[in-house]
Structure formats: C-alpha cells, structure tokens
C-alpha cells in the first residue's frame, strides 16, 4: 500500500507540475503561499487515495483540494470548464472517448489503477444458477461496456462475433 501511495503521489505531483507549466490562469495560491491544486475524483477509491496523498504533497508545498463527484461525466465537464485543475478517476480510453464526444481538450498526465470488473447480484450466488435469458446490466459507455462484454464472454454467458 505504501508503494501504491508513493506512486499515486508521484503521478499527482507530476500532473501538478505539468499543469503548473501550462500557464493555467485558474491556479490559485493559498494564503500561506503554497500552490493550490484542485482535483476532482469519484469518492471510492479515488478521493480516498487522494486524502492519503494530501500530506505528501503538502511537504512539497502543494495544497491539495479534493472535489468529490458521484458520476463519471461531471469531473470531465468541470475540468473542461476549468473549475478544477485535474481529475483522477478514469482510464485513458474512457477519457479519450468522452473528450471526443464532448469536444473537450483532455490529456492524460499519468496512469491510474484500473478498477476490476465483476458480476454482482443480490439473488444469484453462482453463475451456474443464472437463468437462461436473464438480463444483465452493463456500463453505458463504449469503453467500459466493451470490457463488460468481454467479461461476459470469458464467463461463457455470451458469444461475441470476431472483430476481424
């Protein structure tokens, strides 16, 4: 966990330096002269990770202000509107697809961990108990929807056509 936090701090610090070098007029200085970095994140686990990174960045003179979001659209829109300096919640394919669809100029300042995808049910405890014709919800965005379809295929629940 300590290695992960150190890596997260490095990525965020790198992003902060990248943002600082971009001449963003939205940057603020804290009352004590520290640089303020406003990052948007989804609550779990991203904002939790940022809370752990906050004291590490403070040692480097960066005050981290975290804005929590409850969906995956608003952080990118807030970034596009310069309400925040960066966000921390998504993988690059999702960011690129979102930026293209919403005509935003978003770039990755560093990698993030990729959340595992799983099958969840309150009623069904084993896939062999899944009734034929059962409905399964998947994410509504192309990148994560594609990941979900591949997971369903790997579990033998669907067959996808060959992409060639």
Q: What are these model-derived regions, one by one?
A:
Residues 1-36:
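Short, low-complexity disordered leader/linker segments with a strong preference
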Residues 23-38, 57-58, 126-133:
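Immediate post-signal peptide segment of exported/extracytoplasmic ligand-binding proteins
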Residues 32-44, 62-68, 135-136:
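Short, well-ordered beta-strand elements
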Residues 56, 73-87, 100, 150-151:
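Short helices/loops that flank or line small-molecule/ion binding pockets
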Residues 66-77, 164:
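Short helix-initiation/N-cap motifs at beta->coil->alpha
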Residues 80-90, 134, 157:
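Alpha-to-beta junction loops
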Residues 97-109, 124:
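Ligand-binding "clamshell"
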Residues 109-159:
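A conserved helix-loop-strand patch within extracytoplasmic ligand-binding domains
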């Amino acid at each position: 966990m300590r290695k992960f936090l150190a890596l997260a701090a490095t990525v965020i610090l790198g992003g902060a330096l990248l943002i600082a070098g971009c001449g963003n007029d939205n940057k603020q200085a804290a009352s004590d002269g520290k640089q303020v970095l406003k990052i948007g994140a989804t609550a779990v686990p991203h904002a939790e990770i940022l809370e752990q990174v906050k004291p590490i960045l403070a040692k480097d003179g960066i005050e981290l202000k975290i804005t929590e979001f409850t969906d995956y659209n608003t952080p990118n829109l807030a970034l596009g509107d310069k309400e925040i300096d960066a966000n921390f919640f998504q993988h690059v394919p999702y960011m690129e697809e979102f930026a293209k669809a919403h005509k935003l100029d978003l770039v990755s300042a560093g990698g993030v961990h990729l959340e595992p995808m799983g099958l969840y049910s309150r009623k069904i405890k084993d896939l062999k108990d899944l009734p034929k014709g059962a409905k399964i919800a998947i994410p509504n965005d192309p990148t994560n929807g594609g990941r979900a379809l591949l997971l369903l295929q790997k579990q033998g629940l669907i067959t996808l056509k060959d992409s060639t």
